[in-house]
Curated annotation (Swiss-Prot):
This is 1-deoxy-D-xylulose 5-phosphate reductoisomerase. Mn(2+) binds at residues 158, 160, 234. NCBIfam families: Dxr (TIGR00243), PRK05447.1-1 (NF003938), PRK12464.1 (NF009114). Keywords: Isoprene biosynthesis, Manganese, Metal-binding, NADP, Oxidoreductase. The keyword Disulfide bond does not apply. It catalyses: 2-C-methyl-D-erythritol 4-phosphate + NADP(+) = 1-deoxy-D-xylulose 5-phosphate + NADPH + H(+). PANTHER family: 1-DEOXY-D-XYLULOSE 5-PHOSPHATE REDUCTOISOMERASE, 1-DEOXY-D-XYLULOSE 5-PHOSPHATE REDUCTOISOMERASE, CHLOROPLASTIC. GO terms for molecular function: 1-deoxy-D-xylulose-5-phosphate reductoisomerase activity; manganese ion binding; NADPH binding. It comes from Aromatoleum aromaticum (strain DSM 19018 / LMG 30748 / EbN1) (Azoarcus sp. (strain EbN1)). One of its GO terms (biological process) is isopentenyl diphosphate biosynthetic process, methylerythritol 4-phosphate pathway involved in terpenoid biosynthetic process. 1-deoxy-D-xylulose 5-phosphate binds at residues 133, 159-160, 189, 212, 225, 230-231, 234. Its cofactor is Mg(2+); Mn(2+). Pathway: Isoprenoid biosynthesis; isopentenyl diphosphate biosynthesis via DXP pathway; isopentenyl diphosphate from 1-deoxy-D-xylulose 5-phosphate: step 1/6. InterPro entries: DXP_reductoisomerase (IPR003821), DXP_reductoisomerase_C (IPR013644), DXP_reductoisomerase_N (IPR013512), DXPR_C (IPR026877), DXPR_C_sf (IPR036169), NAD(P)-bd_dom_sf (IPR036291).
Length: 403
């Protein structure tokens, strides 16, 4: 009797392969060559790193958004004897995300640039591993509609939303009342300024804002954590992912970042997901779901941790969190405007053009000025994003620090 045919490897497209989430995804893939293979790897402009990844993982496709960088990569791979086909431009991101031969898509491109390929993967019915916040913040209704209509499988990668997903009943059909879900509790570390005097926040430097106490992250998301806008965006995401109203989503400051989030049920039970702060855990969970695989993560030692602390968020210290709740309640284009204004304000702060405490001021002023924008299709969403950025830039100029 012949041996059974081994199962086909799952083909994984990694959008944003050279970023933090992309590299962690490839780390997990490399640990399980018997289960997964890289189908397509994409990047914005990082030729050298993508070249190295192509030699290591031999994907069928490599995509660089920058055409000159793509030409450079194509020549280098050809000289190295690689069979990887190099594609260029934003349209190529959409093509590989929706490619019929790909099984799963890690959507890890940061910012509005990641929206179109993530939406394409959802419309193509893929298993979508969603790490791109903007897909839901900018286009929550549109994105979830695409998931439902295509039968795509949506698995959240943010550690908080992945924790909520794990604490919900398997097969949860976005019906909290039927499942007895009372509240979703999103944990937040509180960032580096949880205990710093409010008066001194105006003097915060970019390096201080990027020094997160628990997680290793990029500079933009580190600033978002310092302002707690990151948690505000996650509140909006949770609303769309789990169909929970804003008043049933509570943020809990938990400095140790051991409990990644919780779900409270009607019978009084609270289910929590715990683990060391390592993004490979939610990535491995989503790749193998409903099975469990090794992620290379150090086991959690509760005795080493000793105790867990919880606090209410301080909305005076963190006005960005309040702005996010307000945008979610307002609906329409408010969340898209919030996100665009935040990206522009954070970029200006990192360039030392505005102070740290100016970030929420710029966002609030942009929300006030950029109203009545449409978000009923992807073109309208991107237009609202662009118009909000124009307004935010004018608000930045009005507050810009003189050299």
């Amino acid at each position: 009797m012949s041996d059974p045919t081994p199962p086909r490897l799952q083909r994984v497209t990694v959008l944003g392969a050279t970023g933090s989430i992309g590299m962690s995804t490839l780390d997990v893939l490399a640990r399980h060559p018997d289960r997964f293979e890289a189908f397509a790897l994409t990047a914005q402009i990082q030729v050298e790193r993508l070249f190295e990844l192509c030699l290591r993982f031999s994907p069928r496709f490599a995509v660089l958004v920058d055409s000159a960088a793509a030409s450079d990569l194509r020549q280098r791979l050809k000289a190295a004897g690689s069979a990887t086909e190099v594609l260029a431009g934003p349209g190529a991101l959409v093509d590989v995300a929706a490619h019929p031969d790909s099984d799963a898509v890690m959507a890890a491109i940061v910012g509005a640039a990641g929206l179109a390929p993530a939406l394409a993967a959802a419309r193509a019915g893929k298993r979508v591993l969603l790490a791109n916040k903007e897909a839901l913040v900018l286009s929550g209704r549109l994105f979830m509609q695409a998931v439902v209509e295509s039968g795509a499988e949506l698995l959240p990668i943010d550690s908080e939303h992945n924790a909520v997903f794990q604490a919900l009943p398997q097969g949860y059909a976005r019906d909290p009342q039927r499942c007895g879900v009372r509240r979703v509790l999103l944990t937040a570390s509180g960032g580096p300024f949880r205990e710093r005097s409010i008066e001194s926040l105006a003097d915060v430097t970019p390096d201080e804002a990027c020094a997160h106490p628990n997680w290793v992250m990029g500079r933009k998301i580190s600033v978002d954590s310092a302002t707690m806008m990151n948690k505000g965006l996650e509140v909006i995401e949770a609303h769309w992912l789990f169909a929970v109203p804003p008043e049933a989503i509570e943020v809990v400051v938990h400095p140790q970042s051991v409990i990644h989030s919780m779900v409270e049920y009607a019978d009084g039970s609270v289910l929590a997901q715990l683990g060391n702060p390592d993004m490979r855990t939610p990535i491995a969970h989503a790749l193998a779901y409903p099975e469990r695989i090794d992620a290379g993560v150090r086991p959690l030692d509760l005795f080493e941790i000793g105790r867990l602390n919880f606090e209410r968020p301080d909305f005076v210290r963190f006005p960005c969190l309040a702005l996010a709740y307000d945008a979610l309640r307002e609906g329409g284009a408010a969340a898209a405007v919030l996100n665009a204004a935040n990206e522009e304000a954070v970029a200006a702060f990192l360039e030392r053009r505005v102070g740290f405490t100016r970030i929420p001021d710029i966002i609030a002023a942009t929300l006030e000025r950029a109203r009545d924008l449409s978000v009923d299709c992807i073109e309208a969403i991107l237009d609202a994003d662009a118009r909000a950025r124009e307004v935010a830039r004018s608000e930045i100029l009005a507050r810009q620090t003189t050299p």
